[in-house]
């Protein structure tokens, strides 16, 4: 049998601020190398808000990321937007909402450029939705429709909602 193993970025290197899931800013290449050597062929990239435009996905050098993935024979299948947990759109004023919307659109466009098709939005833990937040979350996501269609990127929602509320 030929299995294609995948992992979430950062699992093969040191914890960041004692968190198991965080973008490994200083060790992202090492993380890919270790994953490749251990038979992993798929990765879900992680994006935190801190220095988000300095990550290889969003900076002008996303060719660096593309080349590293190619060299390691690893396919980036998704991006987890952990920055959502650090900057909740439904708790923003209009300026903050526009800034976050720009970040999300930039992420989607760069995902498209690299052929990554799934953006995971975490609505769990710190970013869990209250009933009152649902309309704001729907409104925020609705404004991404054109960008998503044009880029062929889909959103996957990680949620702690009861199934009947999803």
Residue ranges: model-predicted function:
Residues 1-106, 112:
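N-terminal pre-domain/capping segments
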Residues 26-29, 68-72, 87-166:
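Active-site acidic/histidine proton-transfer and metal-coordination neighborhood
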């Amino acid at each position: 049998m030929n299995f294609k193993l995948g992992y979430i970025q950062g699992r093969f290197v040191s914890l960041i601020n004692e968190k198991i899931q965080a973008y490994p800013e200083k060790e992202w290449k090492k993380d890919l190398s270790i994953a490749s050597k251990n038979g992993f062929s798929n990765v879900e990239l992680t994006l935190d808000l801190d220095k988000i435009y300095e990550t290889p996905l969003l900076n002008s050098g996303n060719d660096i990321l593309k080349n590293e993935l190619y060299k390691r024979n690893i396919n980036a299948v998704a991006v987890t937007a952990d920055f959502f947990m650090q900057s909740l759109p439904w708790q923003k004023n209009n300026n903050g909402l526009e800034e976050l919307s720009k970040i999300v659109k930039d992420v989607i466009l760069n995902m498209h450029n690299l052929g990554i098709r799934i953006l995971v939005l975490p609505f769990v833990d710190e970013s869990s939705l209250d009933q009152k937040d649902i309309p704001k979350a729907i409104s925020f996501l609705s404004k991404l429709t054109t960008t998503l269609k044009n880029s062929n990127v889909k959103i996957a929602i990680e949620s702690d909602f009861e199934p009947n509320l999803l």
